[in-house]
Amino acid sequence: MKKIILTLSLGLLTACSAQIQKAEQNDMKLAPPTDVRSGYIRLVKNVNYYIDSESIWVDNQEPQIVHFDAVVNLDKGLYVYPEPKRYARSVRQYKILNCANYHLTQVRTDFYDEFWGQGLRAAPKKQKKHTLSLTPDTTLYNAAQIICANYGKAFSVDKK
């Protein structure tokens, strides 16, 4: 009986200490870069959300479709790696923009242990595509207009 009580006490103590360690991991404050790296376009002033201009490409089968990556430099580290001291500093999102109807599809999200979507990649096991219709006069809609004007081909951008 004493062995059972001792075993349960040790198990409970271990479980409590594991939760405390995990809580400490969630509080990793980061200082994202203040200067915009060459090749990246900041979408909103004072927000760490960027388009990687070197990732932009036009679909050769459907020229109204433009593919690109958005990068978010995080201000709080995310523990998504198996190593307890490694954490994500940035998120890279692969997106597809349909310039004919301004539908934006987020295809994939990956975490990286360095800023600017660089370094060791960690991908969630299950990911779903999400598509939304961009609303006029929003930051994403304005960015989409610029991308479509510069990259999208053979389509009409008139939305009347």
Curated annotation (Swiss-Prot):
Task: Give the observed phenotype of the deletion mutant.
Answer: Mutant displays a reduced binding to vitronectin, laminin, plasminogen and epithelial cells, and is more sensitive to killing by human serum compared with the wild type.
Q: Which GO terms describe its cellular component?
A: cell outer membrane; cell surface
Region annotation (Interaction with laminin and plasminogen) maps to: 41-68
Q: Which UniProt keywords apply?
A: Cell outer membrane, Lipoprotein, Membrane, Palmitate, Signal, Virulence
Q: Where is the lipid attached (S-diacylglycerol cysteine)?
A: 16
Topology class, membrane:
Lipid-anchor
The answer to whether keyword Ligase applies is no
N-palmitoyl cysteine lipidation: where? 16
Give the location in the cell: Cell outer membrane; Cell surface
Q: Which stretch is the leader sequence?
A: 1-15
Residue ranges, annotated region (Interaction with vitronectin and epithelial cells): 84-108
Instruction: Summarize subunit and interaction data from the UniProt record for this chain.
Output: Homodimer. Interacts with host vitronectin, laminin and plasminogen. Can interact with both immobilized and soluble vitronectin.
Function per UniProt = Acts as a multifunctional adhesin involved in direct interactions with host epithelial cells and host proteins, including vitronectin, laminin and plasminogen. In addition, interaction with serum vitronectin plays an important role in bacterial serum resistance, and conversion of plasminogen to plasmin at the cell surface aids in immune evasion and contributes to bacterial virulence. Induces a pro-inflammatory epithelial cell response, leading to interleukin-8 (IL-8) secretion and up-regulation of ICAM1.
Q: What is the name listed in the Swiss-Prot or TrEMBL entry for this protein?
A: Surface-adhesin protein E
Annotated organism of origin = Haemophilus influenzae (strain NTHi 3655)
Native organism taxonomy: Bacteria, Pseudomonadati, Pseudomonadota, Gammaproteobacteria, Pasteurellales
Name of encoding gene: pe
